[in-house]
Amino acid sequence: MSYRIGFGIDFHRLQQGPKLFIGVVEIPHSKGAVGHSDADVLLHAICDAMLGALALGDIGVHFPNTDEKYKDIDSKLLLIEVYQLVKQKGYRVVNIDSSVCLEAPKIMPYAPMMRQSIAFLLEITEEDVSIKATTTEKMGFAGREEGLFAFANVLIQKLQ
């Protein structure tokens, strides 16, 4: 069987006002991520990783921020659409390993809900979804709580 790996990364600014969604889950915080969509940094990194594994470009190619139909869209819908491409190409998702970097809030209490939601959407088990959290030790834009970012690796397998 053939395997392919993809890597994704995404960044968003943080500011007062918007809600903060990470890995489908709304996380209570005084700041939220700013973006054309709901700015779910983790789902965007996973989308980029799946697209990369298929050599189909990136999230901006498929869902341009110049297209009003994606304005404030729920990133779950983007993830589902990218996953449909994975299936159309004859692959399945094997596993995901991801890291989210932000100074605050602490997100690991929400990781089980994130894993469950992502696993459900991608038809895999929670054990196949790894979510880790880290900080920049107060360095840079993330350390100043001006933004956050996420990395994701996705392994896909060609179905027979």
Predicted regions and their residues:
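SAM-dependent methyltransferases
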Residues: 1-2, 160
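Short, glycine/charged-enriched secondary-structure capping and boundary segments
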Residues: 21-22, 114, 144-147
